[in-house]
């Protein structure tokens, strides 16, 4: 089971170590609000694709307000000069949600080499620049262990190196206990748009066992 399902979704729950990316409560309009959250997340990722965003957490504490927490490697790109970019984003979300109370919090990801989303985006960006996929994968693995990662698995699928037949290649180093629910495993995917087609990148990073009686966000 742990080998097939998404490592993040497998560990989401009130008694487990992962949390949802959208936190809201609605009796009748849950579907509408959830679709809104998806559109907001897509908008942020498209506008600031160079900021290497790790996670967008959307909270709705009431019917009149929305709180958006953005974790990114390069927060300055999202903020902009004198806060111009974040003001544009706030106005766009106000027009989309029809809410006047929109709060945006931006957090810098310091240990970005053990953040699966950022690692996957970095590998995809290197593949688009025609860097060898083996070199990109091995560089990511080495950098992960330097920042405290205990295990990492990287997979690339597609026409690797311009080959006519698509294939999948992967590297794994360290531990990767996918069946252990208390294992803190970060998982993410990315796509590299190359001249030969799309190459899919998957990254699993094991950060150790979570032993405290507290949920990991």
Curated annotation (Swiss-Prot):
Organism, by scientific name, is Rickettsia prowazekii (strain Madrid E)
Family matches, as PANTHER family: 30S/40S RIBOSOMAL PROTEIN S3, SMALL RIBOSOMAL SUBUNIT PROTEIN US3C
The protein's matches in HAMAP family, at most eight in alphabetical order, are given as: Ribosomal_uS3_B
| NCBIfam families reported for this sequence | rpsC_bact
Q: What is this protein called?
A: Small ribosomal subunit protein uS3
Tell me where in this chain the KH type-2 domain is found.
Answer: 40-110
One example of the protein's molecular function in GO is:
mRNA binding
Extract the InterPro entries matched here. KH_dom (IPR004087), KH_dom-like_a/b (IPR015946), KH_dom_type_2 (IPR004044), KH_sf_prok-type (IPR009019), Ribosomal_S3_C_sf (IPR036419), Ribosomal_uS3_bac-typ (IPR005704), Ribosomal_uS3_C (IPR001351), Ribosomal_uS3_CS (IPR018280)
Pfam families from the UniProt entry: KH_2, Ribosomal_S3_C
Q: Which PROSITE patterns match?
A: KH_TYPE_2, RIBOSOMAL_S3
Family from the record? Belongs to the universal ribosomal protein uS3 family.
Cellular component terms, GO, for this chain's entry? cytosolic small ribosomal subunit
**Alphabetized UniProt keyword annotations:** Ribonucleoprotein, Ribosomal protein, RNA-binding, rRNA-binding
Q: CDD domains this protein is in? A: KH-II_30S_S3
Assembly, per entry: Part of the 30S ribosomal subunit. Forms a tight complex with proteins S10 and S14.
Q: Which SMART domains match?
A: KH (SM00322)
Its gene is rpsC
Q: What does this protein do?
A: Binds the lower part of the 30S subunit head. Binds mRNA in the 70S ribosome, positioning it for translation.
Q: Which GO terms describe its biological process?
A: translation
């Amino acid at each position: 089971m742990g080998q097939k399902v998404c490592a993040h979704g497998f560990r989401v729950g009130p008694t487990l170590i992962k949390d949802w990316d959208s936190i809201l409560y609605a009796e009748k309009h849950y579907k509408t609000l959830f679709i809104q959250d998806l559109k907001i997340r897509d908008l942020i990722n498209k506008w600031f694709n160079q900021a290497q965003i790790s996670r967008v957490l959307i909270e709705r504490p009431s019917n009149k307000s929305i709180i958006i927490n953005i974790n990114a490697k390069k927060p300055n790109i999202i903020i902009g000069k004198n806060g111009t970019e974040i003001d544009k984003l706030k106005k766009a979300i106000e027009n989309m949600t029809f809410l006047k109370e929109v709060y945006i919090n931006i957090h810098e990801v310091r240990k970005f080499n053990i953040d699966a989303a950022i690692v996957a985006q970095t590998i995809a960006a290197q593949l688009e620049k025609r860097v060898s996929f083996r070199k990109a994968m091995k560089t990511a693995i080495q950098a992960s262990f330097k920042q405290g990662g205990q295990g990492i698995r990287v997979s690339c699928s597609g026409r690797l190196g311009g080959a006519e037949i698509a294939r999948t290649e992967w590297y794994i180093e360290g531990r990767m206990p996918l069946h252990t629910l208390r294992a803190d495993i970060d998982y993410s995917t990315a796509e590299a748009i190359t001249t030969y087609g799309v190459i899919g990148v998957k990254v699993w990073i094991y950060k150790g066992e979570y032993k405290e009686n507290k949920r990991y966000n």
